[in-house]
Amino acid sequence: MDSSTIQILIAMVIYMAVVIGIGVLYAKRANKNSEEYFLGGRSLGPWVTAMSAEASDMSGWLLMGLPGVAYWCGLADAFWTAFGLAVGTYLNWLLVSKRLRRYSVRANNSITLPEFFSNRFRENKKVIMLLSAAFILVFFTVYASSCFVTCGKLFSTLFGGDYVTMMLLGAAFVLLYTILGGFLAESASDFMQAIVMIVALAVIVTIGTVSAGGLGEVMNNAKEIPGFLEFFGMATPTVNEAGQQLVEAGKPVFGGVTDYSILTVCSMMAWGLGYFGMPQVLLRFMAIRKEEELKRSRRIAMIWVVISLAVAVFIGIVGRVLYSDAHLTKSAAENIFITLATSSLPPILAGFVMAGILAATISSSDSYLLIAASAFAKNIFQGVCKKDASDKQVMWVSRITLLVLALIGIVIALDENSVIFQIVSFAWAGFGATFGPLMLFSLFWKRTNRAGAIAGMVSGAAMVFLWKLVISKLGGVFAIYELLPAFVFSCLCIVVVSLLTKAPSKEIQEDFEAVRSGKV
């Protein structure tokens, strides 16, 4: 290693030591009982609730995936995705947060999402609990793999090591930390990591813009690429059979402008629908100490989200201007943040900025693994297999499950040509369509019953797979993001099945009215 690489490594090691320290600090408290381990004893303040919710939501996708999209094909895809996410974030905090916090207490003090849905409908056979836990295991394992891909790309790009080896090192660190501290440690570190992420974004976009000659120069140079700065048109890189962009006279080659229809806009904005079913965000709503503090949390979260999304998109544009031919495949384009940091900053500062990517990855992957493990340990092991299991047994089963899920995620992440944005988009659609409609109808429609809930979950998840793997291949209007049709289909199934089957019991309707009136 040269001296620059050593300095970057030192900065990142310091950061990781601080994160491990947080895990050690909270480990004793996390081992008290399962509510402390999985939900932090419902003790989160407004700042930690807001920042940890958004940091765990965004992941390395924010610093690598989203800038990579803007770098590869320009403003349209990245902007409409970011816009949809900002709107979805606001609506989730406005509509869902307060009522879910209240309802989760009313529903037998539920501490996981599957447990909430099961208790909400007072089911005895625990079918909803089993199904929702199973879907969480599937989609979060896929989600966690995207974080491991981020680790592999980050470390192999910085230190020149083999991708698989670097990915395994990153996964091992994430796993160790998550097993150690539980939800409270995860939320506390996510708060710190949210700060690191937004500082890293601010530093890179500022340095990059100055290096390019200022904002005016960035925009003028970007306009030279056909469709690059259009909202209703998209730049089209000309690629060879291997998917590598062609270069002529030192400049990357672009074809004509790809049309961007209103349907495509709606498809990209549909990312915002995913928030209503995103467990890592919904659990923060359940974990805040007082529902009255959610309004303040919403404001904090929105400021963070709008700034971070806007800056991430602009980093991709700045990167294309400064390093137009540095990354010639869609997968490699996701390294533009790393390129800007290592080429524009002193090594020690670049190391701390790189810690921003590590922060984003850790803040998400620990959430994904912890929630998936809790779904199995709390809702399948204790909920169905061994109902008299002690808290200590539940926590040990959770930790073993963490290890198994991480190993599966590692297998998925072995392909170094994986595109982070594409992995995240599929898992995001899975959660959004499986749990989003059910969450909204559970909170706001009294007539929703157990049969409708099951139909909504199964139909939403099935449609995501069907649309992604089969229908989207037809092209044209069918090439839209799978979340949109799956979300709509799930809503229809909930309504139709609920109306065709027996109304909820008197007790369930009384619970609903008590939550709506605030008399919990």
What name fits each language-model region?
Residues 1-520:
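Membrane-embedded helix-loop-helix hairpins and adjacent transmembrane boundary segments
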